[in-house]
Amino acid sequence: MVWLGVDLGNARVGLALSDPELTFAHPAGNIHVAGDYFFAIDEVLNVIEDEHVDHVIVGLPLQMDGTEGKSAKKARRWAANLEKRLQAESEDSDSTEYQIPQVSLIDERLTTVSAHRQLFEAHKASNKHRPVVDQQSAVVILQTALDRTRE
């Protein structure tokens, strides 16, 4: 069993994968999207297929008061589009063994702050954070989901 974490950034979509035991999340790269992260769905579908992903965890960027702003609504639409594409892939598949991965949203407030802190603690120069902060945020999102399954 493998889970995929997704952080929808403005320039990049960060990805993280779990280990098969669902214990640890690790960075799995970025998809450069330049503001249109709906473009990333094709790439995410490739990762899902290549890594045999069972569950996709998408960060939901709620505002600090818990309400949904524009970014959260975009994340919901993105996750819904991913689910539709997965359903279509399932219907087009000849395999009777194909299981559609579950897609879930998880509150990602302060994950970018946490990601920057982790990168700083790893002695990564702050000017080097930008290219990796989205995938590190995806790690935080996915690790949060993994930890909640064990609680």
Swiss-Prot record:
Pfam family name, one: RuvX
Enzyme kind, highest EC tier: hydrolase
InterPro entries named in the record: RNaseH-like_sf, YqgF, YqgF/RNaseH-like_dom, YqgF/RNaseH-like_dom_sf
Keyword Lipid biosynthesis applies: no
Source organism, top-level taxon: Bacteria
Recorded GO CC terms: cytosol
GO function term, MF aspect, one: nuclease activity
Membership in a protein family: Belongs to the YqgF nuclease family.
NCBIfam families: RNAse_H_YqgF
Protein name: Putative pre-16S rRNA nuclease
Species of provenance: Bifidobacterium longum subsp. infantis (strain ATCC 15697 / DSM 20088 / JCM 1222 / NCTC 11817 / S12)
